[in-house]
Amino acid sequence: MKILSAEQIRELDKYTIEHEPVASIVLMERAANKLTTTLTDGYIRKNDNIIIICGMGNNGGDGLAIARLLIQQGFLHVSAYIVRHAVQGSDDFEANEIRLKNIGGFRYIETEMQIPPIPADAVVIDALFGSGLNRAAEGISAQVIRAINQSGAVVFSVDVPSGLYCDKPNSETDAIIKADVTFTFHAPKLCFMFPNNGQYVGWFRVLDIGLSKDFSNSQTTRYSYITQQTIDSIIKTRGKFSHKGTYGHALVCAGSYGKVGAAVLSVGAALRSGAGLVSTLVPDCGYEIMQSSCPEAMVHTQADKEQDELFNVEVKRNKGHLSLGYIHHLDLNKFSSIGVGPGIGTEKDSFEFLESLFRKYNKPMVIDADALNIIAEHDKIKAMIPKGSILTPHPGEFKRLVGEWSDDLDKLELQARFAKKHGVVVVLKGAHTSVATPEGYIYFNSTGNPGMAKGGSGDVLTGVLTALLAQGYTPARAAAIGVYIHGAAGDLAAEQQSQTGIIASDIIANLPKAFKQFE
């Protein structure tokens, strides 16, 4: 699903009006009907005190139409207010102003004294400003926004929380509605993906109001939203006559003394994500744990002294961390993909291991956790990252890789720049995890929940991605499928248990169910 700019959204409306064809006032009525139907399906009740705050543009026209429809449906306490922030409203706004006046009326807000009391048990429908806003709310509009935010009432925003820019970050001092739910039309807006805007957008729902899909699909944009339909179009089905060799051999390099659990989680996730064979390379201290925890995986550890002599190498032996002694005897080319980093530590031995791994293996890898921290500390090894690799930092790890950023949009630019410079896919983990490709595209994930913000969740993602790479997916597609499936499994776990109570192992347990929806 493409994420369009405010200008593209205006052109989309215009194209739909001209080519459907449909009158703009009819399109506004369609949007109001859709939103009203959604609101009455569990969000509001007939006896609620509903306060609708309208601007004088088309967003305000939507609000006036919603007020009229609710009154016509028998809602008992609907009050509509028009904030006089302009001399004249849009044509469709004025048409709906007349329609509402004929059945119920409204009041104007021109001064602070005219702002109505907003009880904490009221429901506010925010239709003040829409996606076309290009300057900060000020004057009476800002005063109304602050009054709504201070009221404690439940707030539902129409299309975009009023005061929020569609395509760029706001200033910290801007007056912006803090919505509980935002009902947006056609597709999410870029601003919904910014972490700093979570306090304003709340949860959002996308409503289809029949805007032209042909026009939307023809638009060029670097931003997209990963949905179930996206994954359904790119995920492969397993062939009747396929065998384990068809689905690749994944190797997970993970764990250290006290952190073998990271390896258990990554390997367990890889086993549940479709790879034909899964091997793991762990320190000696993790051998028995891995053998008993993941019997389906093949476990490799440190070369013995005879192997050292056979390969004519002399290495320091380390039972607690991966080091050079763990890699020289392995034929890495037999692996279809390698995932590295969870729990390996950042000691000198770990650095030498990672450097040697990058020298010996030139296929795309999944690079996470401590491997990213090692890369951040050594420019030499940063230049050695195999092209096409998938890097999976959380914000702290990403900051160590690229430095500080000024705002959420700047962070996305740094993510895209790093992906292009190094020829890698960067998966920046968090709410609406973003996937940046070397070609400059950025995809945002639609699945996942705050319950997944716990230790081990990232290790699970590493295993999922490594398994998908092993199956022959391109790095970009592996990343898109991986973050979606990972989040979907977390959603299933939270639904069965709770966001508070789920742990990383619960995500692994639900991976098969997440994949099942595509079979």
Task: Please describe what each predicted stretch is.
Residues 81, 139-161, 360-378:
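Short, acidic/small-residue loops that bind anionic groups at enzyme active sites
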Residues 105-112, 138, 163-167, 231-236, ...:
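Short gly/ser/thr-rich secondary-structure transition/capping motifs
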Residues 121-123, 128-221:
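Internal gly/pro-rich beta-alpha loop/helix module
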Residues 97, 141-145, 179, 354, ...:
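Amphipathic alpha-helical segments in well-structured domains
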Residues 96-97, 122-127, 333-342:
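Small/polar-residue-rich loop-to-helix segments that shape phosphate-bearing ligand pockets
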Residues 58-61, 86, 133, 162:
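Phosphate/ribose-phosphate-bearing ligand recognition and processing surfaces
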Residues 1-82, 90, 192-365, 373-391, ...:
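Small-residue (G/A/S/T)-rich helix-start motifs and N-terminal tracts that mark the onset
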Residues 65-121:
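Gly/Ser-rich phosphate-binding catalytic loop and adjacent alpha/beta segment
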